[in-house]
Amino acid sequence: MSDTVNTRRRLILGTALASLSLADLGFGDFAHAQSAPDAAAQPRAAGGAAFGPLRQIDAGLLNVGYVDVGPANGPVVFLLHGWPYDIHSYAEVAPLLAAAGYRVIVPYLRGYGSTTFRSADTMRNGQQAVTAVDIVALMDALKIDRAVFGGYDWGARTADIIAALWPQRVKALVSVSGYLIGSQDANRKPLPPQAELQWWYQFYFATERGAQGYAANCDAFNKLIWQLASPKWAFSDDTFARSAASFRNPDHVAVVIHNYRWRLGLANGEAQYDEIERRLAAGPAITVPTITMEGDANGAPHPAPAAYAKKFTGKYQHRTITGGIGHNLPQEAPQAFADAILHVERL
């Protein structure tokens, strides 16, 4: 089923590995993470309002910074951000969901904000499997068995992976740009010239010049990505600066560069994730109820909805959000994204 929503007019908020745990995969300590004291910092939401207290918890390899808003006993939704963005993509989505009774958890991914590695010896790995393992470890640390997941960009890929490999942890899924699970083998195949052009930054990051350039010009680089990915989004300097603060994370550059080099097979992952990557390379179906979304002005590389629809074998709907909506759909069209979260369990 497909549905097209014009956010300029519609502003009403609507109401295998599947059986394996992290311990089974050799990540036994992840389920025994301990809470750390809450940080005093409070990320700022839209209009300067507080986006709830920023919390910290040890989970797996990380000490994760996250926002937790809404009733503590409400149904849980995890909202996962992409690159080069941060938790503030959901600054307007989270209050809408909290008002509807959801407990909303928005974590900084590894390499962003206040999320840090617990050991200096841990590889600053950005391969696709590791972010999914991070989030499952966070669920275990928070003692959350199941949740609704929403995401875009890296966050959508991470949510897709969890839904595909740990469906027992996922009630339902909202995924911007649909099915984003990939593999190194698939990424080695050349694309048509216009498609290759869209991935210019990936090829830049493959060089030492690119790594140095990103480190030296991180804010300017990421602001350019925002502009290219969402050409009709008139975000303010303050809006960008609010998210750019998360790029000060000491591991940000290393994680980002490794992510894009790993995709092309130019950097190795870690052996403990090989089995996960092997299963992901097979393109596993996603069986949980899913709404996929796309903005009509997404300037970033993304697949056409028809190309991935058959990957979702459970209850499924696609929504195209019109009105000049780009890549960062939750921040550009928060009501439409929240509406999808509220409806996905009732498909």
Q: Positions of the model-derived regions?
A:
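C-terminal segment of classical bacterial N-terminal signal peptides
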Residues: L22-F30
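N-terminal secretory signal peptides and thylakoid transit peptides that target proteins
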Residues: S2-L20
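Catalytic histidine-centered segment of alpha/beta-hydrolase-like enzymes
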Residues: I325-A333
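Boundary at the C-terminal end of the N-terminal hydrophobic targeting segment
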Residues: A31-S35
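C-terminal alpha-helix
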Residues: A340-L347
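Flexible "cap/lid" subdomain of the alpha/beta-hydrolase fold that forms the substrate-access gate
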Residues: A36-G52, L61-V64, V69, V76, ...
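Conserved acidic functional residues
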Residues: G82, D153, Q331-E332
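Conserved HGGG/HGGXW glycine-rich cap/lid loop of the alpha/beta-hydrolase fold
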Residues: D68-T116
